[in-house]
């Protein structure tokens, strides 16, 4: 793993040159534009970016694009601020999700997993309000992407079909990029070293690019590499951001940039570890056990070009034109192992190798008009919008005729020769085109009462190559309705309703795509804002009903390649509640704490998605010590989840439960502010070294979770 590829070196050099260009203006550019100067660490500005040094949420556009506060949105909203990302050292999206109220993660492989909320999978991943190229059946570790390029993360639980088309009732995750807002030279440099020889370095530089401060730039680069508690597994990651903003006039802002992310794991597991020995007794593997080989890899590259033009007509009306182009390439060579191990000889496992080349390109364009007007003596708000997206998806697979053997698995070290690969064959190719019109209004007829009414008309067409077939849905309407009532300055009650319509990428046993998920979602709740809005609380109760919900049903081989197939669950329902408190109790005390609980069943009253915990607690808090110890901040948290299970056939062909008991992970941190600009921070995760695992329902296999680990981070801001 002690390697740095030439490709990584070239990209890092290019970004270093760009960052040097920005910092070269530091001696002269001290002006401030009308869009504001960033605070002390110079990484935040504008209503969308989060307050420094706190867990206080700002305004959000993720649920309803009206620039509302969290309290004004009639849905459950969690915001992971930049300060919380730093306090917990949440470096990937999956780590963020594991620490969000009502959200769970099932890491079913070392480099893949699923994020879930309210009993259903989350597949609505958004960057700055624009959907990404994510495809669940062909996921390549996207949820393990770096958070270095993002200022904060918005998570809206429940359906967001009004703004993003996909009416998935689980959640939407919106990653908000760092912006080029600073008119003064600012920088943030971090160096981190952790368990299993993990090392990371990050640089974040921003400055004005002209004397007047009307043109600003920002560059972020992060490189990391390291090994793992899992044998053979190593990683190498590169994340880059170049962005700029220009004030074309007092009322017109042009912004744009490019991001590049590359993840290059070696030795990833494909599938998990067998649960049973061949005699039917349970296995108990050590935490470093792997089924991978030393030639396996899973390289993923994602490039995103983006541009926004915002014009403010007056104090009440504005328009925004946005465009983005995303391209994801994934190239893998993988080894899957099936069967069960003989307890005495170690024999019994069968290897299966396959390689994949995946390319996804997506263009998105949108036009949005926001306005406000006076009616009944109070301010009302309205938004009108059009969205267009076009995605091309191509996947090639390579099989092998090379004979392979695992031998005695107790002696397995991954030193199997790489097989000879056959020529690539087209596995799947399609194009998805969508366009939609949406509108919503925020009506305030009397002071304490507000209504949000809106809807979205969507056209969807998927053309599948090789089958000469297409799937088309025209003028599908998704309504949205919400009501908010302010009892006083502290407490607000709300209710919301939306329908669900979501085409699927999942296939049945015969290779046919499942029909769209359809249904509705209802939510009621109470929100509060204590300490002048510094501490926010939410109590939410919800009921969801869906038809055609995809459930993993088993494995099937198509064109020599193994795939998971799904069945559609009719009449699936989920109902539950969530409680969350997040923000600042005092300027020195940040806290987030949440409890969630749900029940999900199909029409036959059978539990669905049983691999998900029905009850969860997620907490974390930090406190800056007083007096002579004021340079020290300490913190910690607990993530607890109830037991989970899946039913699978054991070696005797009898259905048996694979059960994970309830468990809690304790995480601690401490930071010492050495000088005003220089700090050292220690994070320890899974303090009590709890053993736990994720499960792959279709395969009946498990992947062990991370044991106790630690990281030391040095940060210098100037």
Language-model region placement:
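N-terminal Sec signal peptide and the immediately downstream disordered periplasmic leader
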Residues: 1-88, 94-102, 667
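Short acidic/polar hinge/loop motifs at secondary-structure boundaries
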Residues: 105, 130-157, 176-177
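Outer-membrane beta-barrel translocator/receptor signature
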Residues: 133-134, 149-151, 162-240, 248-252, ...
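Acidic/polar loop-and-plug regions of large Gram-negative outer-membrane beta-barrel proteins
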Residues: 224-228, 241-312, 327-360, 403-426, ...
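Structural signature of Gram-negative outer-membrane beta-barrels, strongest in the C-terminal barrel
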Residues: 247, 360, 379-391, 428-546, ...
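Membrane-embedded beta-barrel scaffold of Gram-negative outer-membrane proteins
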Residues: 308-324, 328-334, 518-584, 591, ...
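Gram-negative outer-membrane beta-barrel transporters
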Residues: 447-448, 543, 567-649, 688, ...
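C-terminal beta-signal and adjacent terminal beta-strands/loops
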Residues: 640-649, 671-718
């Amino acid at each position: 793993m002690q390697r740095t590829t030439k490709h990584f070196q070239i990209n890092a050099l290019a970004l270093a040159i760009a960052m040097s260009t920005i910092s070269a203006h530091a001696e002269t550019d001290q002006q401030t534009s009308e869009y504001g100067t960033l605070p002390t660490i110079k990484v935040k500005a504008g209503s969308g970016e989060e307050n420094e040094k706190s867990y206080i949420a700002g305004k959000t556009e993720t649920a309803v694009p009206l620039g509302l506060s969290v309290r004004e949105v009639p849905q459950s909203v969690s915001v992971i601020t930049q300060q919380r990302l730093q306090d917990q050292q949440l470096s990937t999206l999956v780590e963020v999700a594991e620490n969000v109220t009502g959200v769970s993660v099932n890491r079913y492989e070392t480099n893949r997993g699923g994020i879930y909320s309210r009993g259903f999978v989350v597949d609505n991943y958004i960057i700055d309000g624009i959907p990404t190229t994510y495809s669940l059946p062909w996921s390549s570790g996207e949820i393990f992407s770096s958070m270095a390029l993002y200022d904060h993360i918005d998570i809206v639980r429940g359906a967001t079909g009004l703004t993003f088309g996909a009416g998935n009732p689980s959640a939407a995750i919106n990653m908000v990029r760092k912006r080029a807002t600073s008119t003064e030279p600012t920088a943030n440099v971090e160096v981190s070293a952790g368990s299993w020889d993990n090392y990371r370095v990050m640089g974040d530089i921003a400055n004005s690019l002209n004397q007047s401060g009307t043109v600003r730039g920002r560059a972020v680069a992060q490189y990391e590499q390291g090994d793992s508690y899992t044998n053979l597994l190593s990683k190498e990651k590169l994340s880059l951001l170049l962005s700029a903003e220009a004030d074309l006039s007092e009322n017109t802002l042009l912004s744009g940039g490019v991001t590049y992310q590359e993840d290059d794991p070696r030795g990833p597991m494909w599938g998990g570890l067998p649960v049973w020995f061949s005699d039917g007794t349970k296995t108990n593997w050590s935490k470093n056990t792997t089924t991978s080989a030393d030639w396996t890899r899973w390289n993923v590259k994602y490039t995103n070009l983006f541009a926004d033009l915002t014009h403010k007509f007056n104090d009440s009306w504005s328009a925004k034109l946005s465009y983005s182009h995303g391209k994801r390439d994934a190239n893998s060579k993988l080894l899957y192992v099936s069967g069960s191990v003989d307890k005495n000889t170690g024999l019994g496992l069968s290897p299966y190798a396959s390689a994949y080349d995946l390319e996804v390109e997506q263009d998105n364009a949108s036009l949005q008009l926001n306005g406000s007007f006076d009616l009944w003596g109070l301010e009302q708000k309205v938004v009108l919008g059009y969205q267009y997206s076009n995605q091309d998806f191509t996947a090639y697979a390579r099989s092998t005729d090379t004979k392979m053997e695992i031998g005695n698995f107790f002696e397995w070290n991954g030193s199997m020769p790489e097989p000879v690969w056959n020529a690539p064959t087209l596995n799947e190719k399609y194009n998805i085109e969508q366009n939609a019109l949406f509108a919503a209004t925020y009506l305030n007829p009397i002071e304490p009462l507000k209504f949000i009414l809106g809807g979205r008309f969507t056209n969807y067409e998927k053309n599948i190559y090789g089958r000469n077939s297409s799937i088309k849905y025209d003028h599908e309407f998704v309504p949205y309705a919400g009501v908010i009532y302010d009892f006083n300055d502290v407490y607000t009650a709300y209710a919301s309703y939306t329908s669900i319509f979501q085409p699927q990428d999942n296939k049945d046993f015969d290779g046919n795509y499942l029909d769209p998920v359809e249904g509705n979602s209802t939510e009621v709740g109470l929100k509060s804002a204590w300490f002048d809005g510094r501490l926010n609380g939410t109590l939410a109760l919800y009921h969801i009903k869906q038809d055609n919900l995809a459930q993993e049903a088993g494995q099937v081989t198509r064109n020599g390649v193994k795939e998971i197939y799904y069945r559609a669950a009719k009449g699936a329902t989920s109902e539950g509640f969530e409680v969350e408190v997040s923000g600042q109790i005092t300027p020195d005390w940040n806290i987030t704490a949440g409890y969630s609980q749900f029940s999900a069943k199909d029409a036959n009253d059978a539990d669905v998605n049983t691999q998900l915990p029905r009850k969860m607690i997620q907490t974390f808090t930090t406190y800056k010590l007083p007096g002579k110890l004021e340079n020290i901040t300490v913190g910690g948290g607990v993530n607890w989840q109830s037991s989970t299970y899946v039913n699978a056939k054991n070696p005797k062909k009898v259905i048996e439960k694979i059960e994970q008991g309830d468990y809690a992970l304790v995480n601690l941190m401490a930071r010492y502010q050495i000088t005003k600009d220089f700090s050292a921070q220690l994070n320890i995760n899974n303090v009590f070294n709890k053993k736990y695992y994720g499960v792959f329902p279709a395969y009946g296999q498990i992947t062990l979770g991370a044991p106790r680990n630690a990281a030391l981070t040095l940060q210098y801001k100037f």
